[in-house]
């Protein structure tokens, strides 16, 4: 019996959510451009769900927002939290109406593999630990990227980008002896350098998810 030419299966994907809090697109884009400048490769071609729950203006220019995001190589796949008027406008633009569901922590897959590196990760290098944790005995330099489907442990300074829970594991953590990162992300929730500085010093710490928000906890000496 020949294999069917297509199959329809259910799947879960982790998407970034862009919360729009102002109808002033110039102000929105100015802030977005500032964030993109800090981590351009992280957002390049990224699919986004746009949360419009703070927008009650029925004249909000959703088409303009879509075009502005596309010009920055960001892709709106749908909207959530919109009024009926904006939801109808979204449908004419070919955007899906996404209903937010309750997020529950998924247990890590078993068996869990661990990738161990005893070296510094330098600018321009990228390391990925698929289906497991990443342990680095060394520093992660500016411009370097370390990614893991599980947790990331860095026995040194984290100055580049670290993305844990890349496959959606919300129980993943990022631990480093010195938190000076350009970007940290767990299951799609991220902080840029400015966010990290607001919540942490340059000392050691553990970053994890608390609900849908990142938090950083000090490590015992």
From Swiss-Prot:
It comes from the Bacteria. One of its GO terms (biological process) is division septum assembly. The keyword Cell division applies. Keywords: Cell cycle, Cell division, Septation. Gene3D superfamilies: 2.160.20.70, 3.30.70.260. InterPro entries: CAP/MinC_C (IPR016098), MinC (IPR013033), MinC_C_sf (IPR036145), MinC_N (IPR007874), Septum_form_inhib_MinC_C (IPR005526). The keyword Cell division applies. Cell division inhibitor that blocks the formation of polar Z ring septums. Rapidly oscillates between the poles of the cell to destabilize FtsZ filaments that have formed before they mature into polar Z rings. Prevents FtsZ polymerization. NCBIfam families: minC. Interacts with MinD and FtsZ. PANTHER family: SEPTUM SITE-DETERMINING PROTEIN MINC. Belongs to the MinC family. This is Probable septum site-determining protein MinC. It comes from Shewanella oneidensis (strain ATCC 700550 / JCM 31522 / CIP 106686 / LMG 19005 / NCIMB 14063 / MR-1). The lineage of its organism: Bacteria, Pseudomonadati, Pseudomonadota, Gammaproteobacteria, Alteromonadales.
